[in-house]
A protein has these predicted regions:
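Positively charged interface segments
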Residues: 7-84
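Phosphate-handling catalytic cores of nucleic-acid transaction enzymes
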Residues: 1-4
Length: 84
């Protein structure tokens, strides 16, 4: 399931860096929709490390992962700022 999420939702390049919390939040949303086991942030980080993604520190000290970034989300609601 993690491989499918990476394929569908992520971009891979050595220069990419993304926060662990952002990646995990997207993974959780995707996994819940797909009926997959979400697990913990720790487990997620371990699975990413097993796939040879390296940990890094982002500006401000936040934990990140190198070599991966989230794809921009498509607008699913048509008008995200529509004033009803």
């Amino acid at each position: 399931a993690l491989g499918q999420w990476i394929e569908e939702r992520c971009l891979l390049a050595k220069s990419h860096r993304e926060g662990v919390s952002e990646l995990f939040a997207d993974w959780r949303e995707w996994a819940e929709r797909a009926g997959e086991y979400v697990g913990s942030v720790k487990r997620f980080s371990e699975l990413m490390a097993a796939r040879k993604f390296e940990k890094c520190r982002l500006t401000g000290g936040a934990r990140g992962i190198t070599g991966i970034a989230l794809r921009p989300k498509p607008y699913s609601h048509g008008y995200p700022y529509r004033d009803d």
